[in-house]
Amino acid sequence: MAQISLTFPDGNARSYDAGVTPAQVAADISTSLAKKAISATVDGKHWDLQWPIATDAQIAIHTMADEAQANELVRHDLAHIMARAVQEIWPATKVTIGPVIENGWYYDFDRAEPFTPEDLGLIEKKMKEIINKREPVTTEVWERTRAIEFYKANNEPYKVELIEAIPGTEPIRMYWHGHWQDLCRGPHLQHTGQVPGDAFKLMSIAGAYWRGDSNRPMLQRIYGVAFTGKEKLKAHLHMLEEAAKRDHRKLGREMDLFHMQEEAPGQIFWHPNGWTIYTTLQDYMRRQQRRGGYVEVNTPQVVDRKLWEASGHWEKYQENMFIVEVDEEHAREKAVNALKPMNCPCHVQIFNQGLKSYRDLPLRMAEFGSCNRYEPSGALHGIMRVRGFTQDDGHIFCAEDQIESETAEFIDFLSMIYKDLGFEKFSVKFSDRPDTRAGSDAVWDKAEAALLSATRAAGIEPELNPGEGAFYGPKLEFVLTDAIGRDWQCGTHQVDFVLPERLDATYIGADGAKHRPVMLHRATLGSFERFIGILIEEHAGKLPFWLAPRQVVVASITSEADDYVREVVAELCAAGVRAEADTRNEKINYKVREHSVGKVPVILAVGHREVEERTVSVRRLGEKQTSVQSLADVTIELGRAATPPDLL
């Protein structure tokens, strides 16, 4: 039999018969590894222990200590185990798909009766029984006809449809544990007993259309979470509890910030308190952008399809655009327009007005651009995922040799903004050239080197995402980690070689000839709406004082203090503090409790003593103790706290 060479991570190589499996390789290394092995990586691909290896390859054997691979396999196996459990309890249930998702998995079922929360406990119990059986997981490749006939005989029409959609060149792979099987690409664990039975939990039930098509059957989706150990599951569930307390939708109601309603799906009704946060943040960003050398512009909301066709968005993005057709007077045909989903083509139009010289570069253009994108109703989520939003959008038109310096400046700019908003640390993902791309390798080499060099010069080692760049250029993504460990991708910095060419942007170089500028798409916050949602959840509603919509409430203890309350409010407002009076005929404890729920940072209580001494009793949000300060001192202190950080 032909021999192949397998090279291990330490550089050592061994010879094996062609067709050897990773399980056999693990057994050749040691009995202990053979028992602990869960999967392999072969030439960069995640590989089942049962799959044969036909040619020379790089190989790594994985155990449960390799968390990325272990999590994927555990969650994948649990999807199968859950589907089996459901069919063992309710045999008439039809199965569809069950992919791994972040922190867990889901599986979609076609069942006549709705699942209930109580059913989740029954399913979990059955799943643990299956795990405890420690049944081997086996796999076979079947001929397409055999697989289709098998599922037809078992009344599984969704599996038949899936098989019929698989390209003819791909194998039809089946997986078993015990009597139960599923159509699956794999890989999977060696046996069900490798799944930690105390490290998973079924979380919720939801509806989902088959293939995401509202014209197809409505299915029932069960979500689960899983990890490689009990403590990790416990930590995750604690994080979810904390996240529920911080949910911006809940806090938005308590703080009277905004609401959504069915007549305007994915659109936000900002209340005065919420709009105060929005405008305060926007004013701060406007000042910082001006200091950063940006010129602010504003572009149309409704733009003819001809521009979107020229930019390429009509072809690639039309399904996410809101189309507007108008019968214009005397026009031979309808005018077809679209609400802009992004600002970049419009910014190129401004750049193209008038002749540009190399001396004009870099030209940094910014817009608080209102955009509209169609998002499926099931994807909408509070103010985090909406259809109408405003980007802190910017485009830098520059020469190729300015990419690195502009990237470095943007990273400094972004770091300052995040620090001011309470995020001291962030990580960066770097996505380089995909297989299909525009531009020469030489230009890509230069752009990729520039982004990497600028990032490392800022003391940041980016996480590499090979091949994940856009076809028109490499990109950086800036990821914030919040107080409970969740990651939020906010800022972006994207090199674009294509749009300037498609929209014929040029400048006159030092040689007197026309040149194409490079376009750098950049955003710091992303969308204002989503970032405000992140801020609310990061701070659990206790926003930095300068951003809080209601900074101070001055509450009377007795009606005889009402005039002094109004005087205190006037003093604070004159010092730049957002202060309001509460002179209602309610007990002071009731007032304090109500305003604390509304996340007012400072409550000043005023009674007879405070009137006589011209003081206030200061209660800060989250603190039980109060202190007494003079009106003059508290006005100076709170006036300074209310000042945005860039104005201190």
UniProtKB/Swiss-Prot annotation:
Q: Which cofactor does it need?
A: Zn(2+)
Under catalytic activity, the entry for this protein gives:
tRNA(Thr) + L-threonine + ATP = L-threonyl-tRNA(Thr) + AMP + diphosphate + H(+)
Record's CDD domains?
TGS_ThrRS (cd01667), ThrRS_anticodon (cd00860), ThrRS_core (cd00771)
SUPFAM superfamilies tied to this protein = Class II aaRS ABD-related (SSF52954), Class II aaRS and biotin synthetases (SSF55681), TGS-like (SSF81271), ThrRS/AlaRS common domain (SSF55186)
Q: Which PROSITE patterns match?
A: AA_TRNA_LIGASE_II, TGS
Instruction: Specify which residues bind Zn(2+) according to the UniProt entry for this protein.
Output: C344, H395, H521
Q: Does the keyword DNA damage apply?
A: no
Instruction: Give the highest taxon in the source lineage.
Output: Bacteria
Question: Which positions fall inside the TGS domain?
Answer: 1-63
Q: Which Pfam families match?
A: HGTP_anticodon, TGS, tRNA-synt_2b, tRNA_SAD
Q: How is the cofactor bound?
A: Binds 1 zinc ion per subunit.
> Any idea where this protein resides?
Cytoplasm
Q: Recall the GO molecular function terms of this protein's record.
A: ATP binding; metal ion binding; threonine-tRNA ligase activity; tRNA binding
User: What are the BP-aspect GO terms?
Assistant: threonyl-tRNA aminoacylation
Function of the molecule? Catalyzes the attachment of threonine to tRNA(Thr) in a two-step reaction: L-threonine is first activated by ATP to form Thr-AMP and then transferred to the acceptor end of tRNA(Thr). Also edits incorrectly charged L-seryl-tRNA(Thr).
This protein's assembly is summarised as: Homodimer.
Spell out the family assignment given in the record's similarity comment: Belongs to the class-II aminoacyl-tRNA synthetase family.
Protein name, per record: Threonine--tRNA ligase
Q: Could you tell me the gene encoding this protein?
A: thrS
